[in-house]
Amino acid sequence: MSVLEQKKQIVTEIATKLKESQSTVVVDYRGLNVAEVTELRKQLREAGCEFKVYKNTMTRRAAEVAELTELNDVLVGPTAIAFHNEDAIAPAKIINSFAKEHEALEIKAGVIEGNVASVEEVKALAELPSREGLLSMLLSVLQAPVRNFALATKAVADQKEEQGA
C-alpha cells in the first residue's frame, strides 16, 4: 500500500469518527509529560472514549469531508482528539476535569452531535450531570407529587385514627 493510500485511509477513518461520534473534543496536549498523557488516555478508555493524535493536515481534510470546516481554525500545533460514539458528555467531562488538574491541557473545540462547539460550550457540557444523573433528577421530580399525595393521605388517616381513639 502506498503512502498516499495510507493517508487517504487515515483521512477516511477520521472523517467517519467525526460523523459517527456523539461527542468529539479537540485538545492541545503541549506541556503534558508521557505519564500525564497516559493517565488521560486511561481515564478516557475506562469511559469508552477513543483518544488519538492525528496530523493536522489529515484532520483538516477529514473535517472537510465530514462538513465540519469550522474545526480547521483550531487545528494548529499539537492536537489530540477524543471521540465517543454513545455518550455526548463523557469526553468533555473527563477532559475538563483533567484540564483543571493539569493546566497544560487546553481544550480547543469540540463537535457535539454533528455541530462544532466552542471551548465555552464544551466546558458547559462538561458541567452537566451524566445521563443517569439527569434521569434520576427527572424521576425524583416526577415522583414528588405522588409522594406528597401519599404523605397527605397518611396524615389524614393518622388524624382520623387519633380522633377515633
Swiss-Prot record:
SUPFAM superfamilies: Ribosomal protein L10-like (SSF160369). The keyword RNA-binding applies. Keywords: Ribonucleoprotein, Ribosomal protein, RNA-binding, rRNA-binding. GO terms for molecular function: large ribosomal subunit rRNA binding; structural constituent of ribosome. InterPro entries: Ribosomal_uL10, Ribosomal_uL10-like_sf, Ribosomal_uL10_bac, Ribosomal_uL10_bac_type, Ribosomal_uL10_CS_bac. Pfam families: Ribosomal_L10. One of its GO terms (cellular component) is large ribosomal subunit. Signal peptide: none annotated. GO terms for biological process: translation. CDD domains: Ribosomal_L10 (cd05797). PANTHER family: 39S RIBOSOMAL PROTEIN L10, MITOCHONDRIAL. Part of the ribosomal stalk of the 50S ribosomal subunit. The N-terminus interacts with L11 and the large rRNA to form the base of the stalk. The C-terminus forms an elongated spine to which L12 dimers bind in a sequential fashion forming a multimeric L10(L12)X complex. HAMAP family: Ribosomal_uL10. Belongs to the universal ribosomal protein uL10 family. Forms part of the ribosomal stalk, playing a central role in the interaction of the ribosome with GTP-bound translation factors. This is Large ribosomal subunit protein uL10.
